[in-house]
Amino acid sequence: LLSDCKYSTIGNTNVKWDFVELPSQIMENWVSEKEALNLFAQHYETNENIPDELITKIKESKNFGAANMYLRQLAFGYIDMAWHTRLEPVEDVEQFEKEILAKTSLFEKVDKTAISSHFGHIFGGGYAAGYYSYKWAEVLEADAFESFKENGIFHKETAKSFRKNILSKGNL
């Protein structure tokens, strides 16, 4: 969308897989910032901005269940990489997953269930051996968003620099 690439085959989502989720994930940061919320989050009758204490609660709620969500994403990444690095055929998908998930599971696996059978990203969704990019994007976007937090989340020069030096490059 913001790429300056002449050919679409080197822009948009046709970038290095380590980068593919950064543009979408960085955008999620603005939604819980007071300056952004004040642009639209207003009472429908009084037009009062969302109270500061509610904004604080919204930010704090991001930590609720975060460890479990993190482990879940790691599990997906482990399963993805396990399938795409395995050389021998797998006879028992449930057992295969049980061994993989032992590293990340807080709970015992439920019998007769298999994530792989409905986890479209790793086979048909374009993320084969690349599901890790979601977690990696969180690292990249957190680092990139720090510039916006330091300079103001709507700081024009920071935004121009991010677009020019990061988003516009595509796969160059």
What spans do the regions from the language model cover?
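C-terminal, non-catalytic "cap/extension" segments appended to globular domains
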Residues: L1-E21, I26-K34, N38-L172
